[in-house]
Amino acid sequence: MTYSINHLSSRKPYSINSVFGQTNFTLPLYASTPPSIDRLQLTLLRTSLVLKFEILSGHKLASPQNARHVTTINGTISMHPRLITLGALAASVVSSAVAAQTAPDSSAPTPTESSAPPAAPASWASTITNSIHIEGGATFNPAGPDDGLNFGHLFTDKSNDGLLNQVAITSTRPLDPKATGVDIGYKLQGFYGSDARYTHFIGELDRDQDRRNQFDVVEANVLIHVPILTKLGIDIKAGQYSTPIGNEVIDPTGNFFYSHTYIFNFGIPLKHTGFYTTTHVSPVLDIYAGYDTGVNTSVGSKGGDNAGEFHFLGGFGLNMGKLTVLALTHIGPENPDGSLGPHVNVHSYNRYENDAVITYKFNDKLTSITELNYIRDDGVGATGGGVAQYFTYVLTPEVTAGVRGEVWRDNNGFYVAAFPGNLDYIDAATGRLNGSFGGYVTTYGAITLGVNFKPAKLPKMIDGLVFRPEVRYDRALAGANPFDSGHSVDQFTFGIDAILPINF
């Protein structure tokens, strides 16, 4: 038996802002009789993605004679990190029984009918969401390296020291997945914190802040849906945006772990300036194609960063119910002027960054994510790549456990490095003299165990607060000592952070 959920029946998007793993939610259910609820099934339109919600409890709020019954449904959602905010949803509650034994009054709506008048279409402005998140943490290294660095880490690179990773402000209006005509959205996101050392667009706020905590622009883009070519249409993103490539993201609310993989740190781009299209060929298949100015680059040539050259981003996405695949590539010249020699045209040599993310949901609690990565730079003849495997398991509505294993090969000692100075990373990217070090030809292995703890019954303004403790072990698997200031083959670290959302 199906009951309509009127809160989700309007065009206004229902947003669930989540840290990877789980999110508590409360929804109202209206029916002519109080239902006995087994499960709640929500379908994200256009992608035909089905998310199953475990129903933890139902409480009848009002049930006067011959009147509608209102039941509040509390549950938990487990989500892929790139599906942090859902748009308008079609929803239904599947019920095995109806508690009332007598027939409902004939004047009351039947369970299959909408029991409330249709909501007026939401205004465009009412679908805008604004939020803040604050992330801070620390990573403890019992070896106490002399240089104070956790080698192989970037965003958690400071050993035995606290970091204010991000104080971020986000304003967004996502595209309406139910739109049948032209629809327009946007996303603006910027932050202040230590993460900005590694996320700058070259030429934007990059060398003006010689300190640990810096300002950075992450997203400044326009979203457009146009109903052309296919029944489901095309989505366009134009401006400055985080890369769609890879499993982990800059925004910490989209990641399960505090620390990042070698793939995220050294094997994929982080941001682009340009545009790309997502063509929804069918509910199963999406095709990606776009042009941008390069890896972490802005408009124009800033420090010989190849921003004036053509760079291609493309690939495909598959959505087959429990199984999803996102396979993307980015191709274009990335080496700064002069880095290959005084008489070498760096614009003639491409870098190829290839990545595939395969997600499988065994059930509502257990999720597997496999990431495959390969990178090649023709200019220096360097290759690298590997695989990362994640498993997460929902233990309770408040606690989710996870494990991540990774093997990543730096064949030529070109990609993996440490950057002790606040400007070393951006100076290396633009060919300037810098204090970075690395050059180890080896295979890196890492395994991380962690937990996400989300306290329940928090005030709405800070609902979603999460603590992420983790223990991580890194090891060079082939004849190198990159850790503990170049003295050790391996490294133990213990990290913890907290992400505090402020919801408006």
Predicted regions and their residues:
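N-terminal periplasmic/intermembrane-space "pro-region" immediately following the signal or transit peptide
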Residues: 55, 66-68, 72-153, 430-434, ...
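Cationic, low-complexity basic patches in intrinsically disordered or flexible, solvent-exposed regions
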Residues: 13, 42, 53, 61
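Short hydrophobic alpha-helical segments enriched in small aliphatic residues
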Residues: 31, 60, 67-70
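Outer-membrane beta-barrel pore domains
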Residues: 155-156, 196-199, 207-210, 321-333, ...
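Outer membrane beta-barrel
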Residues: 116-296, 306-310, 317-324, 390-413, ...
